Amino acid sequence: RNIKQHLDLIAGLPGEDYESFRRSFNDVHSIRPEEIQLGFLKLLKGSSMREEAEKYGMVYSPYPPYEIIKTDKVSYKEMIRLKKVEEMVDKYYNSQKFNNTLKFFYEKYETPFDFFYDLGNFFEARGYFNRNIGNTEYYKVFLDFNMEILKGDESYLKDIIKYDYLSFNKRRGMPDFIKSNIDKQLELQIKDELRERYSFKDYQIEKFDIDMSEYLNTGKIIKKECFYLVGNNCEIIKI
């Protein structure tokens, strides 16, 4: 599809509680729009919503943009939870740079909302909301989260993270935590076979321990040694 879908969800609307917002998020997510924008109701001066604030138990910031803090249906603590989900969705989902890795984690949760909530709690526990973290750290978070929270095997996950990383970042700066070693003799053999078709000034050979093509197409993880050419402009070609 050529038209990008951008869908908005507003927290704090009259009559909506935490659970109904969770359901709304999962319904919107199931459409797989390119961007999900989570916003929080703002009670602007002169608006009809501001005039009815007391009716719905709405408490809002006294400072512009007068954002909602709590309602009679959503407590302050629940609003903070939604803020954490918003941060994770904006960074990881809306960037479209982590799609394959996110798919890995969705399979481990009842809903995508629940995953983003847990990831937000992990960010908070690590203090990541209070400081700037580097580009590669955003990828490493997945490994740490998988190990500490889900107690999961990281061997397959590393390959999926690596594929996402190489799709948007140059191989030269690839972090050690997703690097894999390829047998030098085998590397020379592959280069000899492909030398007439590809310049190895522009491409490097990268080894994966799962069939990434199968995972991309079906979501199935099949253990199989595969090799890909990774171009200087983030082009990835299966060989």
Predicted regions and their residues:
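A structural motif corresponding to the C-terminal lobe/cap of the Radical SAM core domain
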Residues: 1-115
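Radical SAM enzyme core and accessory elements
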Residues: 87-239
